[in-house]
Regions:
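Sec-dependent signal peptide recognition
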Residues: 2-9
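Hydrophobic h-region of N-terminal signal peptides that target proteins for export
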Residues: 10-19
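Non-catalytic beta-strand/loop surface segments
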Residues: 18-56, 80-116, 152-206, 230-249
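Short beta-strands and strand-coil junctions in structured, solvent-facing domains, enriched
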Residues: 55-60, 130, 217-218
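Active-site SXXK
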Residues: 64-78
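M16/insulysin-pitrilysin zinc metalloprotease superfamily fold
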Residues: 77-80, 111-142
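Acidic/histidine-enriched alpha-helical segments
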Residues: 132-150, 216, 236-249
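Non-catalytic, conformational "gating/processing" segments within enzyme and secreted inhibitor domains
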Residues: 195-226
Length: 249
């Protein structure tokens, strides 16, 4: 899993060379799910992404890093899939997949041959509301994230000072906490923290599906209705605005 702090181009490599006047279609299902489609017919490939409007800036003290740990756990099984089966299915269909967490969002994506888009939608819809959080898998993934933090931050002579600088420079903004979380919070994280976070934010009315590739927009919309339409929306928490304190002097 890769943490990034800036928006990636929609559709990765496909969108990098897309026509300037590319046609973009937008839809919204009755349950609140937003759908954005950009047609690109130069190759029989499709990139499908699901963006959730939640990231490290939403986290409270004591559970920093929960968004990123949950990102890892999204690959560890649902009511219908065993741990790791999501990735195995994508690979068996000739695809590639990954995910990333940032301050304001968490996103998951797959790149597949265009006829395999239903596979992506079926799997993403399944884990949007049917994730099965397992204590044993959770303990392993927290250790993975802690090691990731050691490697990328604590043992990095450039990253560690920058993290400390950000925590000092931002007095009240939620951007002061690292996306990966503070080590003490990771050590003390509980499965219940992830479960609450998942139930709170992972819902169709807090998600946007983005599809770029050799598709017809209307077909993508119908496919989204089939797979995501039955999912029930959630009552989303109102995020209290947190603005940085005004500088003085």
């Amino acid at each position: 899993m890769k943490i990034v702090n800036t928006l990636i181009l929609i559709g990765a490599g496909l969108a990098a060379h897309a026509p300037v006047q590319a046609r973009i279609a937008e839809y919204q299902l009755d349950n609140g799910l937003k759908i954005i489609v950009q047609e690109d017919h130069r190759a029989p490939i499709v990139v499908s992404q699901v963006w959730y409007k939640v990231g490290s800036s939403y986290e409270l003290n004591g559970i920093t890093g929960v968004s990123h740990v949950l990102e890892h756990m999204m690959f560890k099984g649902t009511e219908n899939l065993e741990p790791g089966e999501f990735s195995r299915i994508i690979s068996a269909n000739g695809g590639r997949e990954n995910a990333f967490t940032s301050r304001d969002y968490t996103a998951y994506f797959q790149r597949l041959e265009k006829s395999r888009l239903p596979v992506s939608f079926r799997l993403e819809a399944d884990r949007m509301r049917g994730l099965k959080l397992n204590e044993e898998e959770f303990k392993k993934e927290v250790q993975v994230v802690m090691e990731e933090r050691r490697l990328r931050t604590e043992d990095n002579p450039e990253a560690l000072p920058y993290e400390q600088f950000s925590a000092t420079a931002y007095l009240s903004s939620p951007y002061r906490t690292p996306v990966i979380g503070w080590m003490d919070d990771l050590k003390n994280m509980r499965l219940e923290d992830l479960s609450s976070w998942y139930q709170q934010w992972y819902a169709p009315n807090n998600a946007t599906v983005v599809v770029v590739g050799d598709v017809q927009s209307s077909d993508v919309y119908e496919l989204a209705k089939e797979h995501f339409g039955p999912l029930k929306p959630s009552v989303l928490s109102q995020v209290k605005p947190q603005q940085e304190a005004s500088p003085k002097g």
